[in-house]
């Protein structure tokens, strides 16, 4: 029988529910259990695909092409699993499906209501996520804060699950903030008490509290919360701020969180062996070298827009016993005149993805600086496309060369819309999304990065591609197309072989990086940057 764990949040948003859920998932997986995890987002968008990065942070893409919340990146990195489209559910997606069924007459004339139709659809998503992965345990995080109007149907669905599958198969974990008032010199439990009261008013009695805090929590505070919130005192778990996120599973294990969960759900599983994870954390805490990487992006005011990129760089740094000193460079600020001032102290330059015209000329100048000064450079998605544009302009002398997306009237459309995208009008969910194969050119830097594999599978999110009519001119000038689709139609990786490392990929390699198994192209780039710093 599948076990269901529901993680809710109270008092404030952005409290770290996703990290708590992911950490618990890692502990249960290391007990030998098969775990999956999902995120419920109460916003009305179908998915975050068309949302501004300033609003939402990065869009995380799964193998099957779902555009999802960035928390899924935490889930995959912590638990080391590949999730699917059932792992992110929004209000918009649920209402869209219910209304589509209503239009088809599938409700047989019934009045369509939040209860039971919306809640049934939500419960079906929970069960489908578990069944498609054949999991022993599914962890479901509900976005937002208890008390939000948007969350009510989700919480009602969670309440009903206890009746549907039995109380012994369901556990509710509530994550709250325990504020410390410096003037009073004490922690305040009232916000947590009121949050739990709100949750109980909706019919959900939490079985465990995870309290987010900056300071150590005395046992007396835990006992008080246990008494007023009606949970066992040992089930009041402290989640204190840490230097590195990957310490959190170890901190939770030290408080027997996973054992309490297993006892509640009657899961007979051996103790979690966290030896390898602990060794990784110890290594992360004691890195001996540092290298500076300049990230040239258009959304640098909100680092979450590049969360997976940053994590992938860190992972590759761990593999090289090196801390990444990340320099955030706003692409809007980069010009041909100041590129050396902004980028001259960087050991490597990464140009990640994005959409739209703003900042693209600055990215092109950053790429030009890297090429002309032989600074290791990695381009991702739009960064790959602009790498091609930069080469066309400044090596092939194609004045005004550009992407058709950015300048439809350009004489040299180096990047063009994909053929199967021409007639598509909707923006959302219509990109080339998900896992696709890439055939590597033997002897190339890309092939060497991937240990001379013939084909790798990586996740994509794009609508435009390299215009193949320009391939002969590029190749004649030494531009290497080192990765292509198996039918040779789509360019996936480009590089300049004579440079230390000048490689750009159309796909998003960062989405498959793990802290104990870094993505190979990122590792090759970071390794080159470290060598460049010596």
Curated annotation (Swiss-Prot):
GO terms for molecular function: ATP binding; CTP synthase activity; glutaminase activity; identical protein binding; metal ion binding. Belongs to the CTP synthase family. It catalyses: UTP + L-glutamine + ATP + H2O = CTP + L-glutamate + ADP + phosphate + 2 H(+); L-glutamine + H2O = L-glutamate + NH4(+); UTP + NH4(+) + ATP = CTP + ADP + phosphate + 2 H(+). Allosterically activated by GTP, when glutamine is the substrate; GTP has no effect on the reaction when ammonia is the substrate. The allosteric effector GTP functions by stabilizing the protein conformation that binds the tetrahedral intermediate(s) formed during glutamine hydrolysis. Inhibited by the product CTP, via allosteric rather than competitive inhibition. HAMAP family: PyrG. InterPro entries: Class_I_gatase-like, CTP_synthase, CTP_synthase_N, GATASE, GATase1_CTP_Synthase, P-loop_NTPase. UTP binds at residues 13, 188-193, 224. Homotetramer. ATP binds at residues 14-19, 71, 240-242. Residues 1-267 are annotated as: Amidoligase domain. The lineage of its organism: Bacteria, Bacillati, Bacillota, Bacilli, Lactobacillales. Pathway: Pyrimidine metabolism; CTP biosynthesis via de novo pathway; CTP from UDP: step 2/2. One of its GO terms (cellular component) is cytosol. The keyword Cell inner membrane does not apply. Its EC number is 6.3.4.2. One of its GO terms (biological process) is 'de novo' CTP biosynthetic process. L-glutamine binds at residues 54, 354, 382-385, 405, 463. Mg(2+) binds at residues 71, 141. Catalyzes the ATP-dependent amination of UTP to CTP with either L-glutamine or ammonia as the source of nitrogen. Regulates intracellular CTP levels through interactions with the four ribonucleotide triphosphates. CTP binds at residues 13, 148-150, 188-193, 224. Keywords: ATP-binding, Glutamine amidotransferase, Ligase, Magnesium, Metal-binding, Nucleotide-binding, Pyrimidine biosynthesis. It comes from the Bacteria. The active site is at 381 (nucleophile), 508, 510. CDD domains: CTPS_N, GATase1_CTP_Synthase. This is CTP synthase. Residues 292-534 form the Glutamine amidotransferase type-1 domain. CTPSs have evolved a hybrid strategy for distinguishing between UTP and CTP. The overlapping regions of the product feedback inhibitory and substrate sites recognize a common feature in both compounds, the triphosphate moiety. To differentiate isosteric substrate and product pyrimidine rings, an additional pocket far from the expected kinase/ligase catalytic site, specifically recognizes the cytosine and ribose portions of the product inhibitor.
């Amino acid at each position: 029988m599948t076990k269901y764990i529901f993680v809710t949040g109270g008092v404030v948003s952005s409290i770290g529910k996703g990290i708590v859920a992911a950490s618990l998932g890692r502990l249960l997986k290391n007990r030998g259990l098969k775990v999956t995890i999902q995120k419920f987002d109460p916003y009305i968008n179908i998915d975050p695909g068309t949302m501004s990065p300033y609003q939402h942070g990065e869009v995380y893409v799964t193998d099957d092409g779902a555009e999802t919340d960035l928390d899924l990146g935490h889930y995959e990195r912590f638990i080391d699993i590949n999730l699917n489209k059932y792992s992110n559910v929004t209000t918009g997606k649920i209402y869209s499906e219910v209304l589509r069924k209503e239009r088809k007459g599938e409700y047989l004339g019934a009045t369509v209501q939040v209860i039971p139709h919306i809640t049934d659809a939500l419960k079906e998503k929970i069960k489908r996520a578990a069944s498609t992965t054949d999991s022993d345990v599914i962890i479901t995080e509900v976005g937002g804060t208890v008390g939000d109007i948007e969350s009510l149907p989700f919480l009602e669905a969670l309440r009903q699950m206890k009746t549907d599958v039995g109380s012994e198969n369901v556990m509710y974990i509530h994550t709250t903030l325990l504020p410390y008032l410096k003037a009073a010199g004490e922690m305040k439990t009232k916000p947590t008490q009121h949050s739990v009261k709100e949750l109980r008013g909706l019919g959900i009695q939490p079985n465990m509290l995870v309290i987010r805090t900056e300071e150590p929590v005395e046992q007396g505070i835990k006992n008080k919360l246990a008494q007023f919130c009606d949970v066992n005192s040992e089930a009041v778990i402290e989640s204190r701020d840490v230097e590195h996120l990957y310490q959190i599973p170890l901190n939770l294990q030290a408080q027997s969180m996973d054992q309490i969960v297993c006892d509640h759900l009657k899961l007979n599983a051996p103790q979690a062996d966290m030896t390898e994870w602990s060794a990784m954390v110890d290594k992360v805490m004691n890195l001996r070298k540092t290298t500076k990487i300049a990230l040239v992006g258009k959304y640098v005011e909100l680092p979450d827009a590049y969360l997976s990129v940053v994590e992938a760089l860190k992972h590759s740094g761990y593999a090289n016993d090196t801390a990444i000193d990340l320099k955030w460079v706003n692409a809007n600020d980069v010009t041909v005149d100041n590129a050396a001032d902004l980028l001259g102290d960087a050991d490597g330059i990464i140009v990640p993805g994005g959409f739209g015209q703003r900042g693209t000329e600055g990215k092109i100048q950053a790429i030009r600086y890297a090429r002309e000064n032989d600074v290791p450079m990695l381009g991702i998605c739009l960064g790959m496309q602009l790498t091609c544009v930069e080469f066309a302009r400044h090596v092939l002398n194609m004045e005004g060369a550009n992407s058709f997306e950015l300048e439809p009237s350009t004489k040299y459309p180096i990047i063009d819309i994909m053929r199967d995208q021409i007639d598509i009008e909707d923006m959302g969910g219509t990109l080339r999304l998900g896992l696709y194969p890439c055939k590597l050119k033997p002897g190339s830097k890309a092939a060497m990065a991937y240990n001379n594999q013939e084909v790798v599978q990586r996740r994509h999110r794009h609508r435009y591609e390299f215009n193949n009519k320009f391939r002969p001119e590029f190749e004649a000038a030494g531009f290497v197309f080192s990765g292509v689709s198996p039918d040779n139609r789509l360019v996936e990786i480009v590089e300049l072989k004579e440079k230390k490392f000048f490689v750009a990929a159309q796909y998003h390699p960062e989405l498959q990086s793990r802290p104990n198994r870094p993505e190979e192209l990122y590792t090759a780039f970071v390794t080159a940057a470290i060598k460049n710093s010596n």
